[in-house]
Amino acid sequence: MISKIDKNKVRLKRHARVRTKLSGTAEKPRLNVYRSNKHIYAQIIDDVKGETLVQASSKDKDIASDSTSKVDLSTKVGEAIAKKASDKGIKEIVFDRGGYLYHGRVKALAEAARESGLEF
């Protein structure tokens, strides 16, 4: 059985491999997802300038106050990041799942962002 440390090393290698091919621009920035055991974080990044344009996480007070499950929190983070992005005029993004499988919390965040108006 693969240990937790080895799983994270494999994820980081996968993420590095994908990042060589994937980057965000000002017209189509990158939506990056980081998942910890308890929280989930999302940022929209312009890699050309090297700056974060928008961020949302399950630690935000308005998101964390009334959710019970981690999948519900991920859905709310996806909706929040899409709302903040539309306020900044961002409609199209490149989705970077951070080496995680497109399943569970990562999938919930992505689908909520899509339903809230982001295109990817």
Curated annotation (Swiss-Prot):
CDD domains: Ribosomal_L18_L5e. It holds the Pfam family Ribosomal_L18p. The keyword Cytoplasm does not apply. Transmembrane segments: none annotated. InterPro entries: Ribosomal_uL18_bac-type, Ribosomal_uL18_bac/euk. One of its GO terms (cellular component) is cytosolic large ribosomal subunit. Keywords: Ribonucleoprotein, Ribosomal protein, RNA-binding, rRNA-binding. One of its GO terms (biological process) is translation. One of its GO terms (molecular function) is structural constituent of ribosome. Coiled coil: none annotated. This is one of the proteins that bind and probably mediate the attachment of the 5S RNA into the large ribosomal subunit, where it forms part of the central protuberance. Belongs to the universal ribosomal protein uL18 family. Part of the 50S ribosomal subunit; part of the 5S rRNA/L5/L18/L25 subcomplex. Contacts the 5S and 23S rRNAs. NCBIfam families: L18_bact. This is Large ribosomal subunit protein uL18. It comes from Staphylococcus haemolyticus (strain JCSC1435).
